[in-house]
Swiss-Prot record:
It comes from Azotobacter vinelandii (strain DJ / ATCC BAA-1303). Keywords: Cell inner membrane, Cell membrane, Membrane, Protein transport, Translocation, Transmembrane, Transmembrane helix, Transport. Belongs to the TatA/E family. One of its GO terms (biological process) is protein transport by the Tat complex. PANTHER family: SEC-INDEPENDENT PROTEIN TRANSLOCASE PROTEIN TATA. Part of the twin-arginine translocation (Tat) system that transports large folded proteins containing a characteristic twin-arginine motif in their signal peptide across membranes. TatA could form the protein-conducting channel of the Tat system. This is Sec-independent protein translocase protein TatA. The gene is tatA.
Amino acid sequence: MGIFDWKHWLIILIVVVLVFGTKRLKTLGSDIGEAIKGFRKAVNTEEGENRPAEPQTGTSAGDTLNKTQTIEGQAQKVDTPVRKD
């Protein structure tokens, strides 16, 4: 179960409806929905404006990311000190 059972949530819902009223809750819900919609629209327009133009050269961004480097040498084992508590 958890901290709150379904009965607890029902009591909390009834108290909230009694305190604020259904009209105020409906208005609050629509205001929150409009705010979320506006936020998503703003994020989408910012992404479109900040997106750089595609490079016109023959190489793509993926070519530069996939280049690998080989490191020459040998691995050495390092002894870690033992803690004495």
